[in-house]
Amino acid sequence: MSPYVLTIMSFSLLLGTTMTLISNHWLTAWMGLEINTLAIIPLMTKPHHPRSMESAIKYFMIQATASMIILFSAIFNASTTNQWMTGQISNTSASFMMTIALAMKLGLAPFHFWVPEVTQGIPLLSGMLLLTWQKIAPISIFYQISPSLNMSLLMILSITSTLLGGWGGLNQTQLRKILAYSSIAHMGWMAIIIMIYPSLTILNLILYLASTITMFMVLNQSSSTKINSLSILWNKSAPNMIIITLTLLSLGGLPPLTGFMPKWLILQELINFNNIPLAMMLALSTLLNLFFYMRIIYSSTLTMFPSINNTKMQWTLYSHKTISPIPTLTIISSLLLPMTPVFITLS
């Protein structure tokens, strides 16, 4: 892809997300979502391959359908309340349709079937954008309309997402599909708390973005797309393998890593609101995700292929120095649990 085209598409992604974040009118928020969708499609089809073209078409159809429902629900709400402000949805039907449309955009179950298939068919860096950057704009709309959402509908979407996100990843061997199902489960955690404690959803999103970006960047650096390809990664790059292990455990929510913080705070808020059965179901569903994270770690560290290298380390000489964000992202995604009181105070 031409550097000029790449620059234009990257700027369009930034513009679309920014428009949605700062807009207080439904039309400009919808325009931002559309710019986001149209900007990422050329990046998804950068290797001109039938699989990537198929994934881009699937993504476009789902996003176009969701955008159509968003626009229709905004017009329907305006026709009954004479309000175009994003934070004001007083019509029950419009709120229901808006929730369904945003669930489609985020990949919440039962509208999640496109997420693993699209992620598997595109390159790793495009998959990283799909599972991270493209979540920001829809969640910002969720945040703005959180007082008008239907709690029962959100509970159904959240529980279904956390359960199916865990079950779907159990029999996967492709790392991109595993991260896609992980994204579905994490979106369920964010959706369940959006009405009760919206600021906690933003905290969860930031930590999820840091962990997922770290995983994708390390996998892209090591050219790993399957679980069995990680078996030889320890001999090629031990630091990358350590980063993958820490990040996966953090995504699974194990203490004392950063990923434990949002799950702990969400369960605490649910218990405070007497939603103990819901908190138990979410906690149990986390075990499904933790199982396939541990399966990756087991396959990559405890079942390594015999090393034919006689030295303790394979030395790799680089002709130029590069500044990588991976160390910083690793610290954010793994070592921020002691900062929990600070985040509670700020939120």
Swiss-Prot record:
The keyword Transmembrane helix applies. It is a multi-pass membrane protein. One of its GO terms (cellular component) is mitochondrial inner membrane. Its EC number is 7.1.1.2. It catalyses: a ubiquinone + NADH + 5 H(+)(in) = a ubiquinol + NAD(+) + 4 H(+)(out). InterPro entries: Complex_I_Subunit_2, NADH_DH_su2_C, NADH_UbQ_OxRdtase_chain2, ND/Mrp_TM. The chain crosses the membrane at residues 2-22, 25-45, 56-76, 96-116, 122-142, 149-169, 178-197, 202-219, 241-261, 278-298, 326-346. The keyword Iron does not apply. Its main location: mitochondrion. It is found in: Mitochondrion inner membrane. GO terms for molecular function: NADH dehydrogenase (ubiquinone) activity. Keywords: Electron transport, Membrane, Mitochondrion, Mitochondrion inner membrane, NAD, Respiratory chain, Translocase, Transmembrane, Transmembrane helix, Transport, Ubiquinone. GO terms for biological process: mitochondrial electron transport, NADH to ubiquinone. Pfam families: NADH_dehy_S2_C, Proton_antipo_M. It is an enzyme of class 7 (translocase). Core subunit of the mitochondrial membrane respiratory chain NADH dehydrogenase (Complex I) that is believed to belong to the minimal assembly required for catalysis. Complex I functions in the transfer of electrons from NADH to the respiratory chain. The immediate electron acceptor for the enzyme is believed to be ubiquinone. Belongs to the complex I subunit 2 family. This is NADH-ubiquinone oxidoreductase chain 2.
